[in-house]
Amino acid sequence: MSRHVGVATADIAGQSTKAAKDTRIDPQRDPRWLVPALAVLAIVTTVKLGIRPVSDPDTWWHLKTGAYVLSDWRFDGPDPWVPFSSRPFVLTQWLPEVVAEKGYSVFGLPAVAWLRCAAMLALLSALVWAARQAADAVPAIMAALAGLLGTGGSLSERPQLVSFVLLAITVGAWWKTAGDLRPRWWLAPLTFLWACSHGLWGIGVLIGLTVIGGLALDRRLDRRTAAKLLAVPVLSVAAAALTPVGPRLLLTPFQVSSNAAQFVQEWQPTNVRDIFAAVTLGMIALTLLSWVRGTSARPWWQIALAGTAVVCTLAMSRTIPVGSIIAAPLLASALQEQRGLAATPLTRRGTRAWVGLVAAAAIGAAPIAGAVAQRPSSWPEGLRPQLAAIPAKTVVLNDFSAGGWLMWAEPQLTPVIDLRSEIYSMDYIREYRRTEEVRAGWQGFLDRTKPRYALLKTKAPLTAALREQLSWTTVGTDADYVLLKAP
């Protein structure tokens, strides 16, 4: 059986029997075991990274939002959980939230962990497919695995994973269009699905415009072809406006970023020491090195994609994965050129082999998720009895990142804030930050929100200030959190 799997998987490279036998055509023919080995390595690595307890601070409010959509079928309006919010809560990620909530309601947290792993396998597959538009199986799998590692800082159980998968598909589609100049009309309905899942859908439109602009600079487009290709991003924007949220969806990325850029770390400029940024920039550097050493001029559309990848990587931590995904087929193309051969087309047999391996990995991941993800990781589950005993509607002064978990774990309580920064005024967030850091006037926020309890990090400055200056007492501690009670 292993022999058949090896033969089938090797077919991903699209190498015909004739090419395999003729060393003059293929002087660097890959060993028969290499493609299967790389495929298994990439898939096993992905499963290893994907199966772990649920821990992301955003996961909890995403689950709560999924339940809200299923019960009320509303997509915007006043926030239903935190009375201190002052802006509408627009549900731009409702589709994966609903899927995750349905999985959780049946199988518990292991379903959420498994969905994360399955999405990562889908991302790997989409990266391989995109890279195969530019290279044979060996360089494609290598570039795809590098791209997956570049996204590593954002591979959590959040709807953005859907964005990464659809972005990789979009990049691969436009790479194919750059080769044959045919519009991929299916990108418009794909964008509709994307816009129901996450706010990065606009990056897909940007990729299309970037490739079209590059092709125009390469003088490969006549007016008719250019008009057809431009119709794809135009229709994609129109499709995004047709989601249940409506046309206001087109403006939500700007509304979110206006608040988040100041207060949320992942929206701030990339740290030069970020390991995932280093991986992504390394991918781009290897590509550029190959271009510099090469003898042929690079097409403008590839140069434009490389520039876009650099900008996305350096713009903010949140978009490092975008740069990594864009860079994957560029790296694959550069590696293919080092082989001195034209890339061979992907075959149905190779596709079936890959899909079979990924499906087997996803099935095998299910019982592992059930074993390791029964309880949340890094959250104060040990304080649930004390929290449950607090009277309903009591206001809790919470750690910024713990707001979502508190809403999900103890919905009868009222947190003062959570990570959905777009629903709060900037003045309110600044006032919270002043209190969190115990700066001058910090007690004014307490007068405004009137909390009777606090759920904070054990060593936070605010924890010490509440104890020492206002005589708050400790109710319990767990997982680096402390529950305090006002006198």
Could you say what each language-model-derived stretch is?
Residues 390-429, 447, 451-459, 484:
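Short periplasmic/luminal acceptor-recognition loop of GT-C membrane glycosyltransferases, typified by
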Residues 114-133:
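Transmembrane-helix motifs of polytopic, lipid-linked glycan transferases
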Residues 140, 144, 176-192, 226-231, ...:
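Short hydrophobic alpha-helices at membrane interfaces in multi-pass membrane enzymes
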Residues 168-184, 289-294:
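Membrane-interface transmembrane helices that cradle and orient dolichyl/undecaprenyl
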Residues 58, 70, 126, 199-294, ...:
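Transmembrane catalytic cores of multi-pass membrane glycosyltransferases
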Residues 352-417:
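Extracytoplasmic
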Residues 147-151, 173, 183-199, 209, ...:
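Membrane-interface alpha helices of multi-pass inner-membrane proteins
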Residues 127-149:
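Transmembrane-helix signature of polytopic, membrane-embedded enzymes
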